[in-house]
Amino acid sequence: MLEQVQKFLLSRAACQGSDSQSRYEELFHKLDVNKDGKVDILELQEGLKAMGMEVGKGAEEKIVAAGDTNKDGHLDFGEFIRYLEEHEKKMKIAFTSLDKNKDGKIESAEIMNSLKVLGIKISLDHADKILKSMDSDGTLTVDWNEWRDHFLFNPADNIQQIIRYWKHSTVLDIGDSLTIPDEFTEEEKKTGQWWKQLMAGGMAGAVSRTGTAPLDRLKVMMQVHGSKGNSNIITGLKQMVKEGGIRSLWRGNGVNVIKIAPETAMKFWAYEQYKKLFTSESGKLGTAERFVAGSLAGATAQTSIYPMEVLKTRLAVGRTGQYSGMFDCAKKIMQKEGIRAFYKGYIPNILGIIPYAGIDLAIYETLKNYWLQNHAKDSANPGVLVLLGCGTASSTCGQLASYPLALIRTRMQAQASIEGAPQLNMGGLFRKIVAKEGFLGLYRGIGPNFLKVLPAVSISYVVYEKMKVQLGI
């Protein structure tokens, strides 16, 4: 992909030990078309295009944003050199992490094994394709010079792109918090990119949940007040507006957004701790171990913030004027029902993690690996439609499997607030719902829940991409 740039760089190296700065200096003067001592985005785009270099979408903007220390929209010679030197250090870390046998060369097997550790399985043929795209001398191995020159103007290397493009739970937020946490590479941990990605994901989740809050509240209302005559989505929305006005459609959304930060932080911390227990002697964490560690991390995070889940449900089903806010709701629950009320529905909630997370992970990994095996050619980027499609499909299947438990959890959280309602346990509620409404009653409210999936993942993806630019990811 970068053959002409590689030839340009290599042909101007006086010898193998040639100083990097002299090569970068000559490259700068070639890109500086108008000879004003600065390189802007347009010059970078045209210069790289003229050299036959195909970079990812928005790569030029990211390069200028990352290197432009004085924020004048250009890269002067000093900024240009500093950016490439810093980028070269990052590329060296990535190269070293892939070169498992420390022979100074990367082979197809090392590419396969490195991706396998992260749950990405590719064939030997696909690994060969990745390697050949970097192999300029036809040796079927990639040394440091080939690696450096291939990724000189890519904000990320190809292996990192495969991992980053296919991150799932960090990028897509559909309102449920039962997904397995994403893996962060050693480079992302060392450079601090991990917390920026979590922050971007948190902001994406907040905007996504707020945008789909009316459908989420309608789902809760249909779960709690389920009946065969109360299943029309439009009618349900009209009733909520009639009872409390337009603002009532967002009742309970504040708690739903606030809990993102502590839950994400706890899940990430717990996942890192559980991974240490399940990592093999070779340092590898397989898909099965990742599922167990991720499920335990999800259970730990849910346990820590579960009272907020109860508050969200109570606020959502509450009447207008019943609670003045989150703290008033918590105070009234404590006074009337005691502290145990904040963990009503906890058992079905924890049990729901296993089918949701397991099926979501299995289907997403299957779809991801199928695309990588059959459709990935020169780029690791699957495109927005493929990403959203895979995320939507896996999440939908996970929801179908765990929805009955989610419905029972919501009923248990809310039943004490309904006058005259008996306080049933999980088994009692299950039998009552099946006897009164049939097995379809266990899926009451799934209509608005499915309706919000596509807009939720779309909103979260767009916001996540915008936040990545703002945070310099």
From Swiss-Prot:
MF term (GO), any: adenine nucleotide transmembrane transporter activity
SMART domains per UniProt: EFh
Residues annotated as binding Ca(2+) 3: 99, 101, 103, 105, 110
A Pfam family annotated for this UniProt entry: Mito_carr
Biological processes per GO annotation: adenine nucleotide transport; ADP transport; ATP transport; cellular response to calcium ion; mitochondrial ATP transmembrane transport
Keyword Transport tagged: yes
Reactions listed under catalytic activity: Mg(2+)(out) + phosphate(in) + ATP(out) = Mg(2+)(in) + phosphate(out) + ATP(in); ADP(out) + phosphate(in) + H(+)(out) = ADP(in) + phosphate(out) + H(+)(in); AMP(out) + phosphate(in) = AMP(in) + phosphate(out); phosphate(in) + ATP(out) + 2 H(+)(out) = phosphate(out) + ATP(in) + 2 H(+)(in)
A GO CC term attached to the entry: mitochondrion
Assembly behavior: Monomer.
Entry protein name: Mitochondrial adenyl nucleotide antiporter SLC25A24-B
Organism: Xenopus laevis
Gene that encodes it: slc25a24-b
